[in-house]
């Protein structure tokens, strides 16, 4: 259905007097790139891994690479390019940038979006293959928890032991590893983990949850990955169609991909080897959500002919900040080594305050803000405070105590 739609679109565009096929493309953007960025953008002879340090122009490289692919003689049609991101905002910004290079008429036909939005689009077109209709419902987190709560109650289980949020996380983890209820029930390690957590009924809850979702014609967010993988695995003719359509696949923030996402990318690209992934193993912080750093660390082993590009110039931070970050990252035992540098000024030294309690930590921050406001007449909006988790509420208590407004 999608292929037919896109072919129809192509015919309409070619017949249009305003066809982008007749447009004169602007190639000046290549001159804006440094040597490493340019090499990454212009290489398209096989799989490529772009290791992009913080502030190194990663988004520019991705967007310019897509523009470059589109404007080459005998190049790619927009609908032959699949670009996967982790947020709708990132996809929207990238498409806007590409449109400025090649025109909105051309950019609009790109397959660009989050993993979930793209796979949802594919699943709706191919729903009958996996026993759904194209109108299937997508459950959000609240819907999923509500259904799990009902199942837990129906099974007569203690909700204090089987907390819906905890159960949901365990099921989500299974799905992110492409483990269906049948596989979960047969998995000794999963069962032992559930027993250790005093939740031996997880396997039964998972089975009921899976069945109830199918009966309701619904998928949760994780199902969008699982069913896409199953679709491509069990119906090779469908996979072949999408392999033929997506002649080039690009993936942003590859260090944040989980096993399921990585596996689907592999399904689509292992044969034609036209894939470019961009990321930074040093920025991998989402393992608690299923991200698998091995996807980027071992990319060159999975795609042996990979060309590796390293974007090492940081355009955002001062030398002091870059050196401090490098001194910490170099201690990582497993990493793709790079020499990040900055040509900006040295900058202010980094101050470190060691507190002896969370209360004192909050007081130090609040008092420092008050001191700087008195000395330099700063406004509250001039300060940004970062903390690791929302559970660090003592800082907020200090703000309240000292009547410091927060936004």
Please provide the spans of the model-predicted regions:
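Helicase P-loop NTPase motor core
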Residues: 50, 56-62, 304-307, 312-399
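P-loop NTPase Walker
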Residues: 18-134, 138, 240, 294, ...
């Amino acid at each position: 259905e999608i292929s037919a739609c896109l072919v129809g679109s192509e015919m309409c565009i070619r017949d249009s007097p305003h066809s982008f096929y007749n447009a004169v493309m602007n190639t000046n953007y290549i001159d804006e790139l440094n040597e490493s960025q340019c090499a990454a953008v212009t290489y398209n002879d096989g799989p490529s891994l772009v290791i992009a340090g913080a502030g190194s122009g990663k988004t520019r490289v991705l967007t310019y690479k897509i523009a470059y692919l589109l404007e080459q003689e005998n190049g790619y049609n927009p609908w032959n390019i699949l670009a996967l991101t982790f947020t709708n905002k990132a996809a929207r910004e990238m498409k806007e940038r590409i449109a400025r290079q090649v025109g909105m008429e051309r950019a609009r036909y790109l397959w660009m979006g989050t993993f979930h939005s793209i796979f949802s689009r594919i699943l709706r077109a191919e729903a009958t293959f996996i026993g759904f209709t194209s109108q299937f419902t997508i459950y959000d987190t609240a819907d999923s928890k509500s259904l799990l709560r009902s199942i837990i109650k129906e099974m007569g289980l203690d909700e204090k032991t089987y907390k819906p949020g905890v159960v949901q996380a365990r099921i989500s983890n299974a799905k992110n590893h492409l483990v269906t209820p049948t596989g979960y029930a047969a998995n000794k390690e999963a069962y032992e983990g559930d027993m250790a957590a005093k939740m031996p009924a997880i396997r039964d809850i998972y089975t009921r949850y899976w069945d109830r979702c199918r009966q309701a014609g619904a998928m949760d967010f994780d199902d969008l990955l699982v069913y896409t993988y199953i679709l491509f695995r069990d119906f090779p003719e469908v996979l072949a169609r999408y392999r033929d359509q997506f002649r080039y696949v690009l993936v942003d923030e590859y260090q944040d991909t989980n096993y399921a996402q990585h596996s689907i990318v592999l399904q689509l690209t292992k044969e034609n080897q036209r894939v470019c992934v961009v990321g930074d193993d040093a920025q991998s912080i989402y393992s608690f959500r299923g991200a698998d750093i091995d996807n980027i660390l071992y990319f060159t082993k999975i795609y042996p002919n990979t060309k590796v590009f390293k974007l090492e110039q940081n355009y955002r931070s001062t030398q002091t900040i870059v050196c401090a970050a490098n001194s910490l990252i170099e201690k990582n035992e497993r990493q793709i080594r790079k020499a990040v540098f900055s040509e900006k000024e040295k900058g202010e030294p980094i101050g470190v305050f060691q507190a002896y309690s969370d209360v004192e930590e909050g007081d130090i921050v609040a008092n420092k803000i008050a001191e700087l406001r008195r000395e330099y007449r700063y406004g509250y909006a001039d300060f940004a405070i970062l903390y690791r988790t929302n559970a660090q509420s003592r800082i907020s208590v200090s703000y309240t105590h000292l009547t410091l407004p927060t936004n």
